[in-house]
UniProtKB/Swiss-Prot annotation:
This is Type III pantothenate kinase. Substrate binds at Y91, G98, V99, D100, R101, T171. Catalyzes the phosphorylation of pantothenate (Pan), the first step in CoA biosynthesis. GO terms for biological process: coenzyme A biosynthetic process. SUPFAM superfamilies: Actin-like ATPase domain. The lineage of its organism: Bacteria, Pseudomonadati, Pseudomonadota, Gammaproteobacteria, Lysobacterales. It is an enzyme of class 2 (transferase). It comes from Xanthomonas campestris pv. campestris (strain B100). Homodimer.
Length: 242
């Protein structure tokens, strides 16, 4: 493969070959906030062009870019644009709109309105109408981050564990139920608001490493594990130099 897509998130690194206008088979692993295992970097593919999106710390981003520059003839780093591939961003200053959210919207663009919920370190929610106009969104802590924050302030509260219940009868279950339920409630409220605003049903797309536990609570949701990489593929196709 001559062109590859790289998505460097806050806690996970994903990459895939560019397969036409979509991402091919995805590989992924977790990384620390400021570092990535040397063996992982040495295992990166090589080719003609690397298309890179990063929301990770600057030091880690630069280390990954330096490694990619030894493996690819060209390394292209995506930045959020006011408009791309039929999507128009609502932010007055597009540079303040996260590149992961931007690419998720490119990946979600279709012929029907959509709400995109990304569940990672943060929970992000964005609404896109059928004409590609972004109507804004929300940012909150993801369930994982909520649990970690509670544990940091009250160490007796475990950072993991428990199962969802509408009314839990032990602490672990209550924590999972509260944090997962808060995320689901925000998504559902946003979906209802989007449908009222646009005057029609709105499709729900969910992505991110923290999304699977929420899917049983969101019966209309479609899970798109590679949504950001698919958006990066769209960006790569539409922004390629002539």
């Amino acid at each position: 493969m001559s062109e590859w897509l790289f998505d460097l998130g806050n806690s996970r690194f994903k990459y895939a070959p560019l397969d036409g206008t979509r991402a091919g088979d995805v590989q992924a692993w977790a990384h620390g906030a400021e570092a990535m295992d040397t063996a992982a970097l040495s295992a990166l593919p090589s080719g003609k062009v690397a298309h890179v999106a990063s929301v990770a710390a600057a030091g880690l981003t630069e280390r990954v870019l330096a490694s990619l520059r030894t493996r690819f003839e060209q390394v292209r780093v995506v930045r959020t644009a006011a408009a791309c591939a039929g999507v128009r961003i609502a932010y007055a200053d597009p540079s303040r709109f996260g590149v992961d959210r931007f690419l998720a919207l490119l990946g979600a663009r279709g012929d029907a309105p959509v709400l995109v919920a990304g569940v990672g370190t943060a929970l992000t929610i964005d609404v896109l109408d059928a004409d590609g106009q972004h109507h804004g969104g929300r940012i909150a802590a993801s369930p994982t981050t909520m649990r970690e924050a509670l544990h940091a302030r009250a160490v007796q509260l475990p950072p993991t564990g428990g199962a969802y219940a509408e009314l839990a009868n032990d602490t672990d279950d209550a924590l999972t139920s509260g944090c997962d339920g808060a995320a689901v409630a925000l998504i559902e409220r946003s979906l209802q608001h989007a449908a009222r605003t646009l005057g029609m049903p709105v499709r729900l797309l969910v992505h991110g490493g923290g999304a699977p536990p929420l899917l049983p609570l969101l019966p209309t949701a479609e899970f798109r594990a590679a949504l950001v990489l698919d958006g990066l593929a769209t960006w790569a196709t539409h922004s390629a130099a002539p």
